[in-house]
Amino acid sequence: MEEPPEGHGHHRDAAPPGPANGGGGGGGGSDGDSAPVSPSPAPASPAAPCPLPLPRRRPPPPPPPRTTNFFIDNILRPDFGCKKEPPAATGAATGAGGGGGGGGREQRDGAQSAGRENVNPLLARPPHAPSSALLCPDSNCAPDGSAPAGTAAKANPGTAAGAAGAAGAAKAQGDGGETPAAKYGEHGSPAILLMGSNNGGAVLKPDSQQPLVWPAWVYCTRYSDRPSSPRTRKLKKKKTEKEDKRPRTAFTAEQLQRLKAEFQANRYITEQRRQSLAQELSLNESRVKIWFQNKRAKIKKATGIKNGLALHLMAQGLYNHSTTTVQDKEESE
């Protein structure tokens, strides 16, 4: 009689875990609901490839600045600075833009074959520039002798290096319809001639290994060595007016006689004697002083005898050079 209630009670006690289990099931259901939420980042996985194209557009880190070896033999060559380089285009340029750039290159190639052999694209524009190539900034290339591209390259070589690296992806789009001969001109292959190699000649490098080549004049520090400097040098006008020289002092016979007498008395005149003599002869003190100096120099040159101090210094090896005194033309006798 008591067992059924116990069994019933036991069943009643076991019932509460049922809701717990149901709650657990509900919890499991909630976990099941949260499980679809966890893969919600999975739709972001298609967007994950977005950073992947960035390495294609983003240029590789620019190489450290290197010093191009160039020699005077290369600079003196008639074709110096006029080697052809594949034109550069920006990474964001569309296929139509690349095609337009290709058309511009074909026109320039036609102009080259017409006789402008020195016109060649050499430097690349910054990334914000259009996809058209720049012509060689050599003074023989441009009719006005200006070098806009050279100025940009000299101002910021690192920007031009980055633009050249960023242009690698868009070259294939813009140059797809061109033949190698039309694309690369006389070379007919995706290669560039490097000036200033170790052996002094030209070196062919494939397009994949193509470094950014700068002409030698970029490294010149004098503006006269650059193509942008004027080819004609203006001659400085010589001064037609001669510098006014003091007229030669003409001593009178009385003045010369008085000066010679003072010189016989003492070859070195004192300041007091010089002032009194200049006042007496109506001469400037500097004229009296210079006359005494010239008189001593003339006697020394005529006799060739050095004073005792000079001989003493020469014996010690401290005075071994001969001195010549420039005589003033004002000396008169």
Swiss-Prot record:
Function: Required for proper formation of the apical ectodermal ridge and correct dorsal-ventral patterning in the limb.
Cysteine-cysteine disulfides: none
Top-rank taxon, per record: Eukaryota
One GO term describing the cellular component: nucleus
Biased composition (Basic and acidic residues): 1-14
Annotated segments matching region Disordered: 1-184, 226-247
Protein source organism: Gallus gallus
Alphabetized SMART domains for the sequence: HOX
DNA-binding region: 244-303
SUPFAM superfamilies, alphabetized: Homeodomain-like
Subcellular location: Nucleus
Record's compositionally biased regions (Gly residues): 20-31, 94-104
Any single GO BP term: regulation of transcription by RNA polymerase II
Biased composition (Pro residues): 38-66
Family annotation (InterPro entries): Engrailed_Homeobox_TFs, HD, HD_engrailed, HD_metazoa, Homeobox-engrailed_C-terminal, Homeobox-engrailed_CS, Homeobox_CS, Homeodomain-like_sf
GO molecular function term, any single one: RNA polymerase II cis-regulatory region sequence-specific DNA binding
Keywords for this protein: Developmental protein, DNA-binding, Homeobox, Nucleus
CDD domains per record: homeodomain (cd00086)
Family (UniProt): Belongs to the engrailed homeobox family.
Protein name: Homeobox protein engrailed-1
Extent of Low complexity compositional bias: 144-173
UniProt xrefs under PROSITE patterns: ENGRAILED, HOMEOBOX_1, HOMEOBOX_2
